[in-house]
Amino acid sequence: MLDPQPLKGRTAVVTGSGQNIGEAIVKLFSAAGANVVVNGGSSREKVDKVVDDIKASGGNAIGVMADVGDAGAVEAMVKEAADTFGTVDIAVSNVSVRKKQRVEDISVKEWQDTINTNLNSAFYLARCVVPLMKQSGWGRIIHISGVDGFAAHVPTRTHNITCKAGVHAFAKALALELGPSGITANTVSPGAIDTTRDWSQYDDPELWRKARIESIPVKRIGTVDDIANACLYLAGETGGFISGE
């Protein structure tokens, strides 16, 4: 029989959890018994709403505003999580920016900012939670990445594709290094997911959507709950033999 609360007693930090995929993850983790840290970088209102929803459902949650591209802010967030709940057992890195630009049009600052948000943020979070996980001999690190990390599918996304490939490599390196300490590290690559994204960025949004559906074996766009369920599997004892994926 499946445990209805497989994360009972665990503490999870989920970055970018004020909306969309991150919100679905943090709410599912709470329903599974975890204490959760809801993070946002710009909208306090969204973070507070998610925290209120979780508390109304009987869960334990705090909201922490922090720019995940700022190493000091991430360190302070993890410290607040540990001070509040005792430790951090699960860390989900779920922040990404994406913009269509030809490589010759990307400024050095835009390149560096994208790398910092999409790739460095995963490192900033991992370096802070790993000591806590090593102390307990148990930990789960999950990166929300993207299919761009496997192959370059769309032109004008050079900076994003580079970051996603880096995130995948980072997870594999973490898995190799941290496995003996009881810590797993994996990526989840959502693909086409229904979120609040602006579909108007595409020249023909409906044509693009139909083409994506046709390329997906199950013939539908994914939901945020699909991604949250995958993360829940990796975050519990069920994911204990999966690492470096």
Feature-to-residue mapping (PLM):
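C-terminal substrate-recognition "lid" of short-chain dehydrogenase/reductases
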Residues: 85, 123, 138, 220-245
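Conserved glycine-rich cofactor-binding loop
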Residues: 11, 18-20
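Catalytic loop of short-chain dehydrogenase/reductase
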Residues: 142-166, 171-180, 192-193
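A glycine/serine/threonine-rich, flexible loop-to-helix segment
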Residues: 3, 48, 105, 155-157, ...
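Substrate-binding pocket helix/loop in short-chain dehydrogenase/reductase
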Residues: 102-103, 110-115, 208, 212
